[in-house]
From Swiss-Prot:
UniProt record, GO biological process: negative regulation of DNA-templated transcription
Species name: Pseudomonas savastanoi pv. phaseolicola (strain 1448A / Race 6)
Alphabetical list of PANTHER family matching this protein: TRANSCRIPTIONAL REPRESSOR NRDR
GO MF annotations in UniProt: ATP binding; DNA binding; zinc ion binding
Name of the featured protein: Transcriptional repressor NrdR
Keyword check for Secreted: no
HAMAP family found in the cross-reference section: NrdR
Family affiliation: Belongs to the NrdR family.
ATP-cone domain location: 49-139
The protein's role, per its UniProt record: Negatively regulates transcription of bacterial ribonucleotide reductase nrd genes and operons by binding to NrdR-boxes.
């Protein structure tokens, strides 16, 4: 770590502690050249993979776009913001867990549908109808019938 006062490379850590609910490490440092002390904060940089669109183009992951799409599906449904945010965290965690630098947008779409299905089946159908481009009522019926046949449904 470079000393911000003299620019020397030799510094030592005097004290380290977790802050921000364990999300950051605060380090008190001392420069071995000039003796000045300073504080640094370290956070993990968690990068989400880039998305490979169906047309082959690539774009950075956009959390706001993901949130907006899920909010649109959940509009006027009895699902709290907290549950939506938890679903977003779960999706991002699964994307990071792939360890890949790029993932197909289809993977994100499937993760969203899985989370929406857990949150609210009406929202799931809304999202699926756009995502899978349902063309007629028959496709809606087939998806609803598939949902009804799943284990654990009355």
């Amino acid at each position: 770590m470079h000393c911000p006062f003299c620019g020397a490379n030799d510094t030592k850590v005097i004290d380290s502690r977790l802050v921000a609910e364990g999300e950051q490490v605060r380090r008190r440092r001392e420069c071995l050249a000039c003796g000045e002390r300073f504080t640094t904060f370290e956070t993990a940089e968690l990068v989400l993979p880039r998305l490979i669109k169906q047309d082959g183009s690539r774009q950075p992951f956009d959390e706001e776009k993901l949130r907006a799409g899920m909010q649109r599906a959940l509009e006027k449904r009895p699902v709290s913001v907290e549950r939506l945010e938890a679903a977003l965290v779960h999706i991002k965690h699964k994307l990071r867990a792939t360890g890949e630098r790029e993932v197909k947008s289809l993977v994100v779409g499937e993760l969203v549908m899985a989370e929406l299905q857990k949150l609210d089946e009406v929202a799931y159908i809304r999202f699926a109808s756009v995502y899978r481009r349902f063309q007629d009522l028959n496709e809606f019926r087939e998806e609803i019938d598939r949902l009804a046949r799943e284990p654990g449904k009355e």
